[in-house]
């Protein structure tokens, strides 16, 4: 009979609990991270999760728009020093350089119990970890 130390038992419990926390790991699949929102916060989160994991995490970015127009440098556009297109960015670099799966669709709801993001066309994207970065929404009618 093989003797196990307390440290080995604790390590086994930790490994087993990791599989429970991220069910895809129990079946040998990569852990899945879904980022909702492709603005400055969401795109940056997706980029660095993919970059820092070195391919060990399956990263999906859900963003309805094909281009993001940044607030950064917008004053240069407003001042006439840059054209409007220069402050727009697509998601091609995230997909090709970082391996991020980009889904151009509205995220309509999240089912935290099932760990899925429901999409506007009726599809779903499952996740182990979720990052919500939907940006802001202004209520123009609330300004007197």
Regions found by a protein language model. Give the residues of each.
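Beta1-alpha1 glycine-rich phosphate/pyrophosphate-binding loop at the start
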Residues: 27-101
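A conserved short coil-to-beta-strand element within the FAD-binding core of flavoproteins
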Residues: 105-114
